[in-house]
Amino acid sequence: MTNKLTPKEKDFYYKSIIPIADEARKEFMGDYEPINNSFETIEQLGFLVLRFPSRGDSDLSGFFMRKSKNNCIYINTNQTLGRQFTSIWHEYYHYYTNDGQGLSYVSKVTTDPSEFKADTFAGCILMPEKIVKQYIEINNILLNRISYIELIKMQNYFRVSLAALLVRLIQIYPNEKDVLQQRFAITKNNLNAITRLQNYTMQANGDTRLIQPTNEVYIPESFYDNLENNLNNNRISKEKAYELLKVIEELFNATE
C-alpha cells in the first residue's frame, strides 16, 4: 500500500509550487482576473484539447502527451465539470514543468508528489491567493462561520469543484482549517451528500454543471477544418494528415 503524503511534505510542495504557478499565470491572465472557461483558455495557448468519457477507470482524470509536434490534453468527462477544470490545469503543469508523465488519477493526488504538485498548481492557477482574499473581503465573508451558500457562490465565481475550493481556502487560511474541513461533508460521494449539494447549489443559483459529470464528447471542429484546409492547399501531405488522425485514435485508445 502506498503511503499518503505527510502534512509536512504537502506544505513543502505547496510552497514550492506557488512561484511556479504565479509565473505561469502571468503569461496569459491578468492579476485579478478569474478564469471563466479553462478549456477555451488552454486552447488559446495552442493545445489540442479532447474531452470524452473514459471507457476504462473512472478515477482517470486526464493526461498530457506530445505527438507529432502537437501538445494534446485529454480530459475525462465522466467527472464533474468542476473537476475537469482542475484536471486541465493539472495536465498543463505536467507540460509546463516536465514533472510527471503518463495517466493522471485523482486518487494518486494524496500519495504521488508529482500528482499532488500538479493539483496544487491547478488550484493556484484557478484561485490565486490575491483574488481569493479580494473576493472574501468584498463579500464580507467570515471564514470561521462560512455557510454552504457562500461557499457555492464562491465556487461558481472561480469555476471549480467545492472540494478544490475548500482545499485552496485551507492552504491560504490554515488557522480556519477545523471549520473548513467540516464543510467537506457535502462533497462526499454518497446519496445524502450529493442531494444536499444539489439543493444548496440551486438555493445559491449556482451552476449545477459544476457538480455533475458532463459525459460529453468534444473534439474541436477547428482540428478537422485546419486538417482539411492544410491538405487541400498542399501544406501537409496525406501521410501527415493520417498521422494526425492517428493521434486522435491513440488518445481514445489510451482511455480504455
Predicted regions and their residues:
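Active-site hotspot residues in diverse enzymes, especially metal/ion-binding acidic/histidine motifs
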Residues: 1-256
